[in-house]
Regions:
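Single conserved hydrophobic/aromatic residue that forms the stacking wall/gate
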Residues: 1-11, 15-17
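Extracellular "leader-to-stem" segments immediately downstream of a signal peptide or signal-anchor
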Residues: 16-91, 96-252, 260, 274-276, ...
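Short, T/G/N/S-enriched strand-turn elements that build extracellular solenoid repeat scaffolds
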Residues: 79-83, 98-107, 251-252, 261-267, ...
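Short glycine/acidic-rich loop motifs that flank beta-strands on beta-rich extracellular proteins
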Residues: 87, 101, 121-122, 142, ...
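Active-site-proximal loop/turn and secondary-structure-junction residues that shape catalytic pockets
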Residues: 96, 267, 277, 316-318, ...
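Right-handed parallel beta-helix
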Residues: 114-115, 152-160, 246-256, 269-281, ...
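Extracellular beta-rich repeat passengers
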Residues: 352, 363, 369-486
Length: 486
């Protein structure tokens, strides 16, 4: 175990160069540097962002904390000015700030004071439909409430809350609500599908769901701009989308009620997520807390995640698109985190086609997650997952598996008859190709779980078996089932 030093955003060291330029704030190490030499793999130190000693307040740009005034322009104007000045801090003071999408730019630290609540508008027309990635595939979605692309030296820090107003976006399943909650939801508007099982915020959202059936939330067909606009409510954005950014810090803030995934760094480098809280309703569809996708060098430490789907999830793209991107998620330290409700505490996949390697997970607690440690993929993905090191994990009240490897996630992969039973389909084993996922060299030790539906479940592919899984000192008590190897 390693002791995590607290982040010293408040304990700043300033320097001044010989030309008397404005002082620069250096964010000190938030983790004992010795850990890098103690890892079971070689990993360079995660670089932290730096910011000039310059700050502005969004009030000076006309922002009003009345919960009624739309502050989109004021907040983005403040960000643009700080960026134009060479960088610094944009301060969001206490108050209720209604806004549309916020675009973070290089060298900007968006700082929220205590009791600052940033509420993203329920007017979905404020979020333009853009080309982006969702669940590992290139598609079109609405712009995220918080986004950055190709930015460097960016941060969201402080003590405030960002509320994505996700209840206005998400479909909701009847079996996840009480009878009273369901009646109230249906009475609020929207539509219910033909089976009476799922509520959607609009007819357009329902159409999007129909066109996306069996295609992982991505609509099929030749669609016009008017088609996309009609389905806008289906094109739920992630709450925070950072794409191809370098030196990123999220610290201290709370992110809640996301339209789909909450935090989604994609193809980023040098990422630190420290002392962050994610709070999504347990019924939130696709309400993952953190999806770290195709990123290199990351610290995920001292966080609390409460999610409607996966808690801490490592990804790298889906199927052929992920393999062509060829960007593994690698060199990641995950320490001292707590995951409450969620479909998995620590998860790899199922979108892992670009590969996953050099992941270190230590000192984490999972309380009531559907599954504890979850590895998932299927035929068609391809990708290599290896060199995963997990230790000192404590879990309680896990309804399903404490540890699972499931290479049949999401149904049957290519090469199988969709009309056959999954196991009967194995009479003809497909050949190993680039579409075959590989899981190997995974080391798990010192895991304690009290209460589980099943202790361990391995469900591998006959053509590419799960290899070299090392388990040491795994204690699962009060489990309904023991170990199942398939």
């Amino acid at each position: 175990a390693y002791e995590i030093a607290s982040c010293l955003v408040g304990l700043e060291m300033c320097i001044r160069d010989s030309n008397n330029c404005p002082s620069t704030t250096i964010v000190e190490d938030i983790i004992d540097p010795a850990i890098y030499t103690s890892l079971p793999f070689k990993m360079d130190k995660v670089e932290q962002p730096t910011f000039p000693d310059y700050s502005v307040n969004i009030i000076d740009f006309g922002a009003k904390p009345d919960g009624i005034t739309l502050n989109t322009k004021a907040i983005n104007d403040a960000i643009q000015q700080v960026n134009a000045k060479g960088g610094g801090k944009v301060i969001i003071p206490e108050g209720l700030w209604l806004t549309g999408p916020i675009e973070l730019l290089s060298n900007v630290n968006l700082y929220t004071e205590k009791n600052a609540l940033v509420l993203f508008s329920a007017d979905h027309s404020l979020y333009p439909i853009i080309n982006t990635s969702f669940e590992g595939l290139e598609t079109r979605r609405c712009q995220s409430p918080i986004s950055a692309r190709n930015a460097e030296n960016i941060a969201i820090t402080g003590h405030g809350v960002f509320d994505g107003n996700g209840d206005t976006w998400r479909p909701t399943k009847k079996d996840k609500l009480t009878e009273g909650q369901w009646k109230k939801l249906v009475a609020s508007g929207g539509v219910v599908d033909a089976d009476g099982r799922i509520w959607y915020p609009s007819e357009g959202a329902l159409k999007g769901a129909i066109l996306s059936k069996d295609n992982f939330n991505v609509p099929r067909g030749e669609l016009t701009d008017s088609d996309w606009d009609y389905m806008r409510d289906w094109l739920r954005p992630v709450l925070l989308s950072f794409i191809k950014c370098n030196k990123v810090l999220l610290e201290g803030a709370t992110f809640k009620n996301s339209p789909s995934w909450c935090l989604h760094p994609l193809s980023c480098e040098n990422i630190t997520i420290n002392k962050v809280t994610v709070s999504n309703p347990w019924y939130s569809q696709n309400g993952d807390a953190l999806d770290l996708e195709s990123c290199n060098k990351a610290l995920i430490i001292n966080n609390s995640f409460d999610a409607g789907d996966d808690g801490i999830c490592i990804k790298s793209g889906k199927d052929e698109q992920g393999r062509k991107r060829g960007e593994p998620c690698q060199n990641v330290i995950v320490m001292n985190n707590t995951v409450l409700h969620g479909h998995g505490g620590f998860v790899v996949g199922s979108e892992m086609s670009g590969g996953v390697n050099n992941i270190y997970v230590d000192n984490c607690t999972f309380m009531g997650t559907d599954v504890g440690l979850r590895f998932k993929s299927n035929r068609g993905r391809g990708g290599l997952v290896e060199n995963i090191y997990i230790s000192n994990i404590n879990m309680i009240n896990i309804p399903n598996e404490a540890l699972i490897f499931n290479l049949y996630y999401g149904g049957k992969g290519r090469g199988e008859d969709p009309n056959q039973d999954e196991k009967k389909a194995e009479t003809t084993i497909p050949p190993v190709t680039e579409e075959t996922p590989i899981f190997r060299n995974i080391f798990i030790k010192d895991v304690t779980c009290n209460g589980a539906g099943r202790a361990v479940f391995f469900n591998g592919l006959p053509e590419m078996r799960i290899k070299n899984i090392n388990m040491e000192n795994i204690i699962v008590s009060n489990a309904k089932e023991g170990v199942v190897l398939s």
